[in-house]
Amino acid sequence: CVARVGDVFEVPGARVHILMCYDQTAIRTGGGKELLPFEECCCSFLFETSAGNIMFLGDTWYHDGYVKVGKEYDIDIAIFDMGFNAPGATDKMTPYDAARLGQTLRAKVLIPDHYDNWVNCAGDPDLIINQFERIVAENTPEIKTVIMRCAGRFDFPKDQDIKRYRYPDGSENYDVSKSVYGNKD
């Protein structure tokens, strides 16, 4: 099955809309000199769930076409790529464009990805995240940012104010009373 822009289907727990993705890299990878139409080579996914609407944009660049998406859909969470690009290798949004994308989509929570794990990111992940958080906080304080870690769990709306994910320390599984240092009555 191939996802096509405009498709809508159901999966357990969600209704999925296949939406436009404006990945300028993807439209250049067809092998010829002609640019491919966006809708033929890339797409975004909007998951409508009982907890809220999650938009996964995958790899994309900022594009004014997202204004229409933000007007047509209520987006609670936007997940997108972000990084710095080496000269001549633009592949990801900068922190500024990522913040602008969140504003354009009218998203409530922004979760960037790829900023910490790709060789062509060409930047210090902490610097990228600090800049992103500052740009969002100063320009669109109504939008929240959440910085996840690999294999971390995010539950919306409960976790929307965590800012930066922290791995559980396991203390919820400890029974101090069974320890030699625990309280003995």
Regions found by a protein language model. Name each.
Residues 2-71, 152-185:
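Core dinuclear metal-dependent hydrolase active-site scaffold
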Residues 27, 88-89, 121, 156:
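Generic domain-boundary/flexible-linker signal
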Residues 40-97, 108, 113, 117-119:
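Metallo-beta-lactamase
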